[in-house]
Amino acid sequence: MAVITGASSGIGLECVLMLLNQGYKVYALSRHATLCVALNHALCECVDIDVSDSNALKEVFLNISAKEDHCDVLINSAGYGVFGSVEDTPIEEVKKQFSVNFFALCEVVQLCLPLLKNKPYSKIFNLSSIAGRVSMLFLGHYSASKHALEAYSDALRLELKPFNVQVCLIEPGPVKSNWEKTAFENDERKDSVYALEVNAAKSFYSGVYQKALNAKEVAQKIVFLSMSHKIKARYLIGLKTQLLLALYQILPSSWYDSLFRLVVLGRKRDA
């Protein structure tokens, strides 16, 4: 049995479909799960839920626990991005970003762990990002939420080792999905000192997403790992992603910062 959040689109949806094809019973959690025609399957139970709603989450897992005695795989795929400068992004948007990307995930894990502990070598896959290793220009709050997820997952892995529950971080680069549409829907204030650079960065990132990874590629990796006996702590997906991390680790911070700004903005900031 598998539990998947963010199940009605992108990587989450692809994981659901692939695990159903492998004969898994899947609990597909998403805000619009029951509206997703692709999830109409005898082995799939769709649950419409905002994962940041704590009371609703508790009720969902009470219902799951009443029907199931174990969970083989938990895939935390729910999440979104907030784009804009650190200074100008409203703090309520920042709180919402962390509520969905981090705190909701923590609660899903807590609620699912009793079921996961009942199955030896069960697995938790937390969908992080290259932004969890390298902070992105004007994606500071999104990057921060993924950095938090990385630290949390490392601690969780250490704690769950005696119970044979494996914890794995999936760190893809840009993936074709609705993510960029949501992230880029808000414009920086026109009077912001960052407006020109934010717009330049948005154009760059939009171009990157035209050549992004396919969600199916990432899902195939996750599903393959879900059926493997032993897995690593993290998987960085995409050659460009691996190159970016290598540059970040090798170059002095000042060099890396200048190079990153030059690539994204096409110029250095005016003095």
Swiss-Prot record:
Which leading EC class covers this enzyme? oxidoreductase
Q: Which residues bind NAD(+)?
A: 1-25
A Pfam family of the record is adh_short
Q: What Gene Ontology molecular function terms does this protein carry?
A: oxidoreductase activity
Supply the EC number(s).
1.-.-.-
Gene designation per UniProt: vdlC
Family assignment from sequence similarity: Belongs to the short-chain dehydrogenases/reductases (SDR) family.
Source organism of the structure: Helicobacter pylori (strain J99 / ATCC 700824)
Which keywords accompany this UniProt record?
Answer: Oxidoreductase
Q: Where does substrate bind?
A: S129
- According to UniProt, the name of this protein is Probable short-chain type dehydrogenase/reductase VdlC
Superkingdom of this entry's organism?
Bacteria
Q: Does the keyword Oxidoreductase apply?
A: yes
Which residues act catalytically here? Answer: Y142
